[in-house]
C-alpha cells in the first residue's frame, strides 16, 4: 500500500481545503485531561499514517495557554532528528511524574496555615524546579524553530497588556523570537502560584527588548480565538500560504479546542455566601483562588460562546469541536493539588471524557449540553481521518512535498 511519509512537514493551506487549528486551555495540573485526549487523537493518526505520525504534522497552528502553552511547546519543539520532542502519548506520563515535584504538597501539621501565610506574602511555589525542568527539556530552541506555527499568550505586568508569542508575528518582529523555555515559563506564571518571569531578547543588530510576564490565562485562558485571529491577520495581509482563502471563510477553518475541566456542575459558591467575602476570601478559599478561577473560567467561556455562535451562524458547526468536562469536584478542580490520588482522578477523567457524548455550549444557559449521539472518542476518530486526508491532499498538490513512500 502507499502512504505519505509522516516525516514530511505539513504543506501550507493553499494546497489543501482546510486551515487546521488545535487549541489547549490553561489549568495547571488539569492539563492531564487534554493530555489524554491528545494521546488518543495521535494514536488514531498513527493507525492511519504510521507510528511516526505526530500532531505537529497535521495542524497549521497549535495554540496553548499556561499549562496548554507548555504542552504546545512540547508538541512542536524539534529534537535532534528534526521531529517533535514529545509524542502526545508521553505528555500524560510527564504530568504524572513531574507535577508532584512542580507543586510539592506539604502534609505536615499546620500545613494549611503555613500555605495561607505564604500565599499572602509571596507565590505559593518558588518555581525553581519547573524552570529547571523546562530549560532541560526545551533548551535554547526559539519560537522561530517550532515544527508548526504556535500561538502562546502571556501578560506583560509592567505595561498591563497581553504579549502574544506567535510564529506569524516573529517573522516581522525578531525581538519576539524568545526561547520556548522562556515563553513556557512565562505563560505558566499564574499569579499567587508561581513567580512572574523576566527575560530579554536581543536581535542580530544588538537591539534588545525586556519582558516582564505572567500567566497567559490573565489575557486568554482559551487561546482558540487568538489562533484564529493570527491566521485571519495572515490572510488579510495577503500571505501566499493561505491563498485563496478569505478572512471570514470560517467554513475552511477546522478547530479542535480542548478544555482542562471545571467545577460548574458542583455549584461551589452562591451570592449569599460570597456577599460577605473580603480580599482574603476572594484570594484564597478552600484550596482555591476564587477571583482568579472566576476570571479564567469567564475568559475560556467567552471564547467558547463566541466561536460557537460564529460557526453556528455560518452553518459550520461541525468545524468547531470543543471538548470540555464540567463535572470536576473537590481537589480535582484545583490547579495545583498534585497528589498521586488527584492526578489519577484527572487522568481517569480524561479517559471518561472520551466516552461522553459530544457537547456544545447552550448560548442561553452557558452550560454544555449533549449535541449528538456520538461520543468525543468517535468525533476524534472522524477528525483523525479528516486531518490525514487533508495532509495527503496537500502533499499531492504541493510541488515542495516529499514524494510518498511505499510500505
UniProtKB/Swiss-Prot annotation:
Induction: By infection with the fungal pathogens B.cinerea and A.brassicicola, and avirulent and virulent strains of P.syringae pv tomato DC3000 (at protein level). Induced by ethylene and copper.
Compartments where located: Cytoplasm
Pfam families in UniProt: Patatin
Coiled coil feature spans: none
SUPFAM superfamilies reported for this sequence: FabD/lysophospholipase-like (SSF52151)
One GO-annotated biological process of the protein: oxylipin biosynthetic process
Catalytic residues as annotated in Swiss-Prot or TrEMBL: 66 (nucleophile), 215 (proton acceptor)
UniProt domain PNPLA: residue ranges: 22-228
Motif (DGA/G): 215-217
Tissue expression pattern: Expressed specifically in roots.
Enzyme class (EC, first level): hydrolase
Residues bearing PTM Phosphoserine: 398
GO cellular component terms, semicolon-separated: cytoplasm; membrane; peroxisome
MF terms (GO), sorted A to Z: identical protein binding; lipase activity
InterPro entries: Acyl_Trfase/lysoPLipase, PNPLA_dom
Swiss-Prot/TrEMBL keywords: Cytoplasm, Hydrolase, Lipid degradation, Lipid metabolism, Phosphoprotein, Plant defense
Domain remark text: The nitrogen atoms of the two glycine residues in the GGXR motif define the oxyanion hole, and stabilize the oxyanion that forms during the nucleophilic attack by the catalytic serine during substrate cleavage.
UniProt family annotation: Belongs to the patatin family.
Entry function: Possesses non-specific lipolytic acyl hydrolase (LAH) activity. Catalyzes the hydrolysis of the galactolipids monogalactosyldiacylglycerol (MGDG) and digalactosyldiacylglycerol (DGDG), and less efficiently the phoshpolipids phosphatidylcholine (PC), phosphatidylethanolamine (PE), phosphatidylglycerol (PG), phosphatidic acid (PA), phosphatidylserine (PS) and phosphatidylinositol (PI). Favors the release of fatty acid at the sn-1 position for PC or PE and the sn-2 position for PG, PA, PS and PI.
PANTHER family for this protein: PATATIN-LIKE PROTEIN 2, XYLOSE ISOMERASE
Entry protein name: Patatin-like protein 2
Designated gene of the protein: PLP2
